[in-house]
Amino acid sequence: MNNIVHKLKTLVLNEAFGGVLLIVCTLLALLVQNGSFSEHYREFLNLKVGFSVGEFELNKPFLLWINDGLISIFFFAIGLELKKEFLHGDFKNPKNIVLPFMAALGGILIPAMLFALVNIGDAYTLKGWAIPTATDTAFALAILMMCGKHIPSSLKIFLLSLAIFDDVGAILIIAIFYTTKLSIAAFVIAGLAILVMLILNLLGITRKSFYFICSVILWISVLKSGVHATLAGIVTAFFIPMQTKNGEAFLEEIYESLKFWIAFIILPLFAFANAGVNLSNIDIGAIFSGVSIGIFLGLFVGKQVGVFLFSYLAIRFKFAALPQGSNLKQLYGVCILTGIGFTMSLFIDGLAYEVSDIFNYADNLAILIASFCSGIWGFIYLKFFTTRS
């Protein structure tokens, strides 16, 4: 019995299993949205949830609590990982930053350029230029793990490192390009919350409740400020102390405690809430619109070309080296997987077009098709067309 429990625990904590769960939730969302439960699915997402304290009221649809709230926890974890890597990890050595940074840069610039070329001249459709710049790390990592032992572990580290810069890029894009009205009062409150966390950090105080209260205040104020609330997650992470005064790991403990919830609750719920594309409302004209073509080309072509090209140039001009034990074929295979935009692309799509059905959901379908093609082709290429160097 203990052996069975151990095997189940190992399976659940396996990163590849988290990716499989995302796939299941995606298919489930598509089935529910296009089946007899579609009305209940939409009612579930539009259900108003909130609270009020005096004159202050926060009442949002459940979908927005997922996209603005739960995903902030995901970005908080990304911030913790980024801080850990810069202070004590691989990024402490500047040379180790170059390859994933250049790869992420190429993975943002080239897809954005392809989307812009297809949609040039239309100011509204151009708002979606950032949709194909994102990568769903959980999906990409899950498929990489399924490709076999001949893929060196250094490529997994490369993909994770690239993902950190990719996510930071997504946060900056959201903060700069998808922010509308700004509230000075909310910014002042956010600044005070940050100041308190800075003082807590400098004093070496490691009471989780203090940081939690400050982070909630920061999140609400950022939400009300006009800047996307996910920014609060990564900002909070920067003020979490690495360790307690007794030398015990503090940041690492918080990060590890969040991994399960993010992999098996937050991201699957996000996938279920956002992947429900109504296929019955899609027409042929919308499928071949500039937005759909731009998204598909950006994710499936632009991502792999941009990531590989910038990585190759960094290696060719000796700014960086290939991940240990890997070759260019294997590196290219990982670059293909970065075209799996899925959850993050759906997220940015919702911000760009404000969850509008003006494209008859063809934009969401294009994200799913491009992500599916990138995943399948990346798996086939890595599994059957690469050899260990």
Curated annotation (Swiss-Prot):
It is a multi-pass membrane protein. Coiled coil: none annotated. One of its GO terms (molecular function) is sodium:proton antiporter activity. Keywords: Antiport, Cell inner membrane, Cell membrane, Ion transport, Membrane, Sodium, Sodium transport, Transmembrane, Transmembrane helix, Transport. One of its GO terms (cellular component) is plasma membrane. GO terms for biological process: regulation of pH. Belongs to the NhaA Na(+)/H(+) (TC 2.A.33) antiporter family. This is Na(+)/H(+) antiporter NhaA 1.
